[in-house]
Design a protein with these regions (language model features):
Chain A
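Signature of N-terminal electron-transfer/Fe-S-associated modules in redox systems
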Residues: 1-177
Length: 177, 456
């Protein structure tokens, strides 16, 4: 990783302020802010790039490897972009009993997510959609459960998926006009 | 008629019109118990919690008062930290979610009281990353509490100072293990720490005495201070005090969360009356009683339960699964555990080998990779189950599965070793005939619905 200052994306003032606010919550050790800053970076840029790791490391006076090892440990932190709309379907027992594998296949088919980019992770050709299996989302009483980006969806059915996709496509068209 | 719920923790959670706003909480008597607590000496609160018999609701069921008692405040010179474990990562469990999403101030009040009792001035809520909305709700609730002086420098004029922050995890099950949680909060990989020391109360966050309690546990503290430890102990049965929130999922007609005093309801009453019976009129086959790490219980088996008689002696009673009361000790006597209260139900159409394969995949994915038996064993078991389920099973596989599982439990730094081997041990022991039939590739099992329609 040879990221230099000029490779860094232009960071807005508000981003840096938010980073400072987060760091202030860990008065004993700045290092504790590593994961929160990775979350912040990912929320802004969609994934954590080597530049992101570098920036966070500098901010926290750490070696980049100390941030990198966190970024690669936690499943939610991504090192590459995924779809604009990310479906995360729960795979674990209660959801599987309620048909989450069928839901997963249905989303895959409906969104034409044909490229397998990782274990249980699929992205559509145009990069708009991605579908992945995740482990227990702690809403087992409403299985099957999924997340669409950071939003939680309960009691998912194929009809619900159709409605969600129709809505997303309409929204997308509006944006294009 | 199903037995009525006794809602202590979830009293207001589902009331129409009840919101997460602080004004709503205050109009329901919120933060009154905090006022009472701040007028008590901290040791008296610890004493009340001890008297209450409160046991941790995260899974292990360890007495909270005893945990708190590990810190010697007379000798201790280091700062004390309080951590709320809101990772809720045990599959089958969704109770803490109800508290966080619907009644966050109850948790905050419980936390301020607990932090005051333990002389902590800094506390964190470690919330699972997937609860993005929950983290937002908590952040807002904490800001409101700060504004009203329930948090900050001089809480309600008592001179007591406390700050609470939210820390979001990022999808790792192992962060529910308290020392893994601490490592994660320190900005490291969530590798659980070597024991001893057995309790973070000795060495925890930043190598300082730390108390780690589950969300529900901290809420119970509020009610204990409100009603007094002795009064609280009258709810439930001896050594199994208070209420518990049972989360039911799987093959029942009405899955959901139900709060009852410990021991007040049996598996049969819960599944057939409260949850409306098994789906499609099917027969009950198996129950995982306390989150996916708990050993599976077979519905048609008799369990030997020690029962205290009136003269104080103990007799062994044979009980069917449906007659077993839901508490800590009776469920433990079956050889399993009530763990986090996550009850997963499977009916007679379910293929138990497929169910175990699903659980094994979870543990193979979630092993943190620190200890060899767990890292290698969890994946090995998953691969064996994959091949059994896809027609490549070998006659010796169930024996080998047991052998691998037996070599993990007790040989790892944290309890994940047990968590990943108990399901394998219990499924193979309880449903051996299904594994053997599948290994022999007998077709008699084709009537069972496949859990997945994938090809591995």
């Amino acid at each position: 990783m040879n990221a230099t200052e000029k490779d860094l994306p232009q960071l807005e003032e508000s981003f840096i302020e938010e980073a400072e606010r987060i760091i202030s919550q860990y008065p004993v050790s700045k290092r504790s802010a590593s994961l929160p800053l990775l979350h912040l970076w990912q929320r802004h840029f969609g994934f954590v790039s080597p530049q992101g790791v570098q920036w966070i490391a500098e901010k926290l006076d750490l070696e980049p490897i100390a941030v990198e090892e966190i970024a690669t440990f936690y499943p939610m932190i991504r090192q590459r972009p995924l779809g604009h709309y990310q479906f995360k379907v729960c795979r674990t027992l209660s959801c599987a009993l309620a048909g989450s594998y069928e839901i997963f296949e249905y989303i895959k088919k409906s969104c034409k997510t044909v490229n397998e980019v990782g274990h249980h992770v699929y992205v559509s050709e145009d990069g708009k959609f991605s579908v992945e299996f995740v482990e227990c989302l702690a809403a087992c009483g409403n299985a099957p459960v999924m997340m669409l980006n950071e939003e939680e969806w309960m009691d998912v059915t194929q009809t619900k998926i159709d409605a969600i996709l129709n809505h997303l496509i309409r929204e997308k068209r509006k944006e294009e006009f | 008629m199903a037995k009525a719920e006794y809602r202590l923790i979830l009293k207001h959670a589902d009331e129409p019109g009840y919101t997460v706003d602080i004004d709503c909480y205050l109009s329901h008597g919120g933060y009154q118990v905090l006022k009472k607590a701040l007028a008590m000496p901290p040791d008296q609160i610890i004493q009340e919690v001890k008297i209450s018999g409160l046991r941790g609701r995260g899974g292990a069921g360890f007495p909270t008062g005893v945990k708190w008692g590990f810190i010697n405040h007379e000798k201790n010179t280091k700062p004390v930290y309080l951590l709320c474990n809101a990772d809720e990562s045990e599959p089958g469990t969704f109770k803490d979610r109800q508290i966080i999403y619907k009644d966050p101030h109850q948790l905050i009040e419980g936390m301020v009281i607990s932090a005051y009792a333990n002389r902590a001035h800094l506390a964190y809520i470690y919330i699972r990353g997937e609860f993005a909305k929950g983290a937002e709700i908590l952040e807002k609730a904490l800001a409101e509490a700060r504004e009203r002086n329930f948090l900050g420098k001089n809480i309600l004029g008592s001179g007591y100072e406390l700050e609470i922050y939210v820390f979001r995890g990022a999808g790792a099950y192992i962060c529910g293990e308290e020392t893994g949680l601490i490592e994660s909060l320190e900005g490291k990989r969530a590798y659980p720490r070597i024991k001893p020391p057995y309790f973070p109360a000795v060495l925890g966050l930043y190598m300082c005495p730390t108390i780690v309690n589950n969300v529900e546990t901290l809420c119970h503290v509020k009610h204990i201070v409100e009603m007094g430890g002795a009064e609280y102990a009258r709810i439930g049965t001896p050594n199994n005090t208070g209420t518990r929130i049972w989360c039911v999922s799987g093959d029942v007609n009405k899955p959901g969360y139900y709060e009852y005093p410990c021991g007040a309801i049996t598996f049969g009453e819960l599944l057939y009356e409260v949850c409306g019976g098994i789906r499609n009129g099917n027969k009950l086959k198996a129950v995982i009683p306390g989150g996916s790490s708990a050993k599976v219980l077979r519905a048609d088996k008799k369990y030997k339960i020690p029962k205290k008689k009136e003269d104080g002696s103990t007799e062994i009673v044979e009980m069917g699964l449906e007659d077993i009361p839901l508490d800590f000790d009776t469920v433990a006597a079956t050889g399993s555990m009530s763990g986090s209260g996550g009850i997963i139900v499977m009916d007679h159409t379910r293929d138990m080998v497929e169910c175990l394969r699903n659980i094994a995949e979870f543990y193979a994915h979630e092993s943190c990779g620190q200890c060899t038996p767990c890292r290698e064993g969890s994946l090995w078991m998953k691969k064996m189950l994959d091949r059994i389920c896809t027609g490549g099973g070998r006659p010796e596989d169930s024996k080998l599965l047991l052998e691998v599982a037996n070599h993990i439990a007790g040989r790892t730094i944290c309890a994940f070793g047990e968590a990943c081997s108990w399901p394998v041990q219990s499924f193979v022991e309880m449903f051996g005939e299904e594994f053997e039939a599948k290994q022999r590739k007998e077709s008699s099992l084709e009537i069972l619905e496949p859990l997945t329609n994938r090809t591995a």
